[in-house]
């Protein structure tokens, strides 16, 4: 067996709880039990060492005595991570390098954040020797050139209804009611007259030109507050004839224990194909959904993606692909349609909104062109703690160089370099740890 394993740490702490009565003591013990019983390791600090933090789970207790509102016990904690941690510290890079000191007693995993100022086909971090991590690849300047894979052709925020026209049709129902904007998204002002079908407002807007290879990102909220609430938020893709050629939807119709269902489908003249139709990895996972629904078509290959976004971080993602060998679903994209809907007389989901819709044209590269993987304004995070690389909150480990590693920084002096040297500004965050 190679490598080494550091055993878990056990901590025992004697406690005294003093109350004015036995009744008050019972309530205090209830509160303490609620605090101690957690599903994950939580921060643990002691009054004589407030600048250090353990991460622990409750592991039982030995009771002492109880008399007249006084109670003693020994509480045991299990730290599967045996180290104790200092407060995080952040150090900015000076131009393209940073020198910092790890004052702990063991190595640490860094988190490096780069705010990109110019496009690049790669981004690399390392110590100038064997330690490095990288996304993308550097071009051969003698015979290669960078190019932008995506060109934005349509970007509509949910803060302005200008330019939208009333749509003609929706799936399984009728266009009724109207939209309003709350400054952050399009929401239903009304759903129209009650019927047995789906109903609700729908608007459409044309793209500047027909787009064959495209990517669309739709940012949507569908948050169910009770299991008897139903509804849907949908974005349709239309061809030049106004026909629906694809749909991105988050909906709740009561199935799978009243789960929100993410759906991305493509359509031809006589049929359709669901690339994604799921509640996620478990029922009700997306019932508080705010996130992105994405569809990309390059040639005859479709890639669909759904992810919740929580505090700027993409999580609980689901993806799927489909190749249209028969050419059934290849009409050029001409317009976008948005819709939120209510089903019959059912109680509707009150928190439903379409916040933003972005459409990109996917550019066809020449043989000697290498795509830029970051653009000005992007934020890239090399998170060596969680073994992840994020671009604007979205995991992009698919871009990671095969030889790159989530390296650690030993105790003492460390220097890191960033390439390209003019890529932007950066900072490193570490949390020193001690045995």
What are these regions (language model features)?
Residues 21-23, 52, 64, 83-85, ...:
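Residue-level signal for secondary-structure boundary sites
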Residues 2-7, 64-68, 103, 207-209:
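Short, solvent-exposed beta-strand/turn "edge" segments of beta-rich domains on protein surfaces
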Residues 27-36:
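Short amphipathic alpha-helices in soluble, non-transmembrane regions
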Residues 38-83, 87-89:
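Short beta-strand and beta-hairpin "edge-sheet" elements
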Residues 89-435:
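Intrinsically disordered, low-complexity segments enriched in serine, threonine, and glycine
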Residues 1-23, 69-82, 414:
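Oligomerization/assembly interface segments of phage tail-like spikes and tubes
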Residues 25-26, 44:
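Short N-terminal amphipathic alpha-helices
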